[in-house]
Amino acid sequence: MSKHVNGQEIIQLFEQFSPKAFAVEGDKIGLQIGTLNKPVKNVMVTLDVLEQTVDEAIEKKVDLIIAHHPPIFRPLKQITTDQPGGRLIEKCIKHDIAVYAAHTNLDVADGGVNDLLAEALGLTDTEVLVPTYSDPMKKLAVYVPKDYEEAVRTALGNAGAGHIGNYSHCAFSSEGIGSFKPLDGAEPFIGQTGELELVHEVRLETVFPASMEKTVVKALKKSHPYEEVAYDIYPVEQSPLEKGLGRIGKLQQDMTLEEFALFVKEKFDVNGVRMVGERNSKVKKVAVLGGDGNKYIYQAKWKGADVYVTGDLYFHVAHDAMMIGLNVVDPGHYAEKIMRKGTAEKLTAMAGEKNYDVRIFASETDTNPFTFL
């Protein structure tokens, strides 16, 4: 049976794969308009929040908008309803539409903007282009009655523990005998007050990023049958989980720069691209960074990219790219629209696992300000 859900629960689900901790310092993320403490039935994912986006949300009875670009990015000195920005906020409040922004945290996230762009290009052996976040790993060891091992292991895996490379739900189990004596006031799941109890238990071990500790412990306590859960958490000596902006990987087959530029235009479904470099130069290794990636041309070159795909390329940065021998293809900032469908599908799948009664869909409003002649 499906469960009613509120906005806070949807955002908690969203932040499992795109936590606020991933955002670069000073980014304007999180709830920007309205409240999450209300029931939601319809959630719309959009790249931009413009007045026409809000009109679409009103028409489709949307309760919550999840946007990549924050509608409130610079401090507001006033909100006047005879200006577009003020009307946008007024409409959201009047129609009880909450607006939540996930900007650079969604760029960085696994399955976020840059992964979607790399996937659209069919890149293999992908790595982070610009590291921005390092998350040390921790290990959890918990003692579980034998018949409840599977339920706890599944809950921990679903909460994000046990993720190693391209594998999820990784864990190790070993059997033993646990002992305890319930004292006055205890309500033991097994045993009697004042009597020593010996129980066949399983020691279950798994790893998780430190940033997910609260989520993992919450899942542990919810799934574990004991009143008082015996568990240990400790740091492990292994490379921290590295996250960041952009991706770099290899094409499935070599192309010329011109062929690749047309390939980008098709895969990103844009009306045109700009290209820097010799048309017939060979392209195999590709760096891609959604949005404005002007400041990262040197990182792309240092990591061996034959071509750098990014938006909003500046005139003088294009000259710099030419001088260092880096090809560039600029599909525009609007190439990030790929996040609408990708994010909506990912969040829909996660909500389905929770059996939430909610509809999550991509906005259909075209917010690209540019027309190509």
Residue ranges: model-predicted function:
Residues 1-373:
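Hydrophobic structural segments
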